[in-house]
Amino acid sequence: MGRAKKVVLAYSGGVDTSVCIPYLKHEWGVEEVITLAADLGQGDELEPIRKKALDAGAAQSLIADGTESFIADYAFPAIQANALYENRYPLSTALARPLIAKLLVEAAEIHGADAVAHGCTGKGNDQVRFDVSITALNPDIKVLAPAREWGMSREETIAYGEKYGVQSPVKKSSPYSIDRNLLGRSVEAGPLEDPWVEPLEEVYDLTKAIADTPDQPEYVDIDFAQGLPTQLNGQALSPVALVEQLNQIVGNHGVGRIDMVENRLVGIKSREIYEAPALLVLIQAHRELESLALTADVTHYKRGIEETYSQLVYNGLWFSPLKDALDAFIQQTQKQVTGTVRVKLFKGAATVVGRQSPHSLYTPDLATYGAEDAFDHKAAEGFIYVWGLPTRVWSQQQR
């Protein structure tokens, strides 16, 4: 008896997911494999991917357009949370996984499948993100992960696929593992596995080399409404269009590159290259707007929430009670986060040079050192005495 009768497989067109099709059928006794490729704005032509799945033995090959939901329902809430894993990575790849899991479960329920499958190995984060998200959405559905169990090397995997007509797309001149969506790219493997080796320029695609960027700065005005990006340079745009345009503008100035060694959930360190031009600038601008609109205590407390939020998303817990609770807190904080932020882009740097908000708590006549100063300086002495009283008492006790 096979492990499942009908399976919906998350499909990318790569070696592992292509080999999963015959492997599920011939090794695990699956009667019918339906593939699902998610369009998340990665820019690939998906029709060849559909054909490749059918040629590899899939009974059906589905394509789900999730781009709008990806930006509006996943990326924009992460911007409100200023989500940066380990204070650097804006989760451009991690944010896609819960949506793909959701699309898989929906397809399985529509087509009457008793299992879903993915091509993740046992070494990365994505296996956790998929398995946990799928289980959270439908605890009764089976999750199959052939690449986690088959024990084949890369060469053996390719050879197995060729036996069933699966052609390898890997070129010897491109040793990298690349994942891409509308938010950005992640690149790993090959020469990048040595953290001392500087990435070649060929690694990057969305951002220009500094030598090729314009010799004049460019200014971008980004409007937010309750923490959500709404306009670019005074033009109202849909979430997808805003990210698309901002990616082009920001990447043209060489902004948006990350080279980091991160701590994976499975306990190993991994050297990753990320490009996320628009997402990084949107988080930077959003955080600056919060500095105007939020009180000091909310701002400081939210920083801890942001770190927990980022870890949850990175660790595959998008669909979890704690994530829901954090969402409620974050949404409460965003009610007054409305305004405009001006960002200067020049030679690989994005610098916030202006911010304004109708809900700004910045009071010029209290902040100024000029003649308009309305701050009561005499009140400072009593405040300092009370504020420092515990320290004074402690110091006296030590004598």
UniProtKB/Swiss-Prot annotation:
Biological process (GO), any one: L-arginine biosynthetic process
Swiss-Prot/TrEMBL catalytic activity: L-citrulline + L-aspartate + ATP = 2-(N(omega)-L-arginino)succinate + AMP + diphosphate + H(+)
GO MF annotation list: argininosuccinate synthase activity; ATP binding
InterPro entries in UniProt: Arginosuc_syn_C, Arginosuc_syn_N, Arginosuc_synth, Arginosuc_synth_CS, Arginosuc_synth_type_1_subfam, AS_cat/multimer_dom_body, Rossmann-like_a/b/a_fold
EC number(s) stated in the UniProt entry for this protein: 6.3.4.5
Any Pfam family the entry gives: Arginosuc_syn_C
Gene3D superfamilies: Argininosuccinate synthetase, chain A, domain 2 (3.90.1260.10), HUPs (3.40.50.620), Single helix bin (1.20.5.470)
Pathway: Amino-acid biosynthesis; L-arginine biosynthesis; L-arginine from L-ornithine and carbamoyl phosphate: step 2/3
Main location: cytoplasm
Presence of the UniProt keyword DNA repair in the record: no
Binding-site positions, L-citrulline: Y89, N125, R129, S177, S186, E262, Y274
EC category name: ligase
Protein residues bound to ATP: A10, Y11, S12, G13, G14, V15, D16, T17, S18, A38, G119
Gene Ontology CC, one term: cytoplasm
Subcellular location: Cytoplasm
Residues that bind L-aspartate: T121, N125, D126
Record keywords, A-Z: Amino-acid biosynthesis, Arginine biosynthesis, ATP-binding, Cytoplasm, Ligase, Nucleotide-binding
Matches recorded under PANTHER family: ARGININOSUCCINATE SYNTHASE
Protein family per UniProt: Belongs to the argininosuccinate synthase family. Type 1 subfamily.
Subunit relationships: Homotetramer.
UniProt protein name: Argininosuccinate synthase
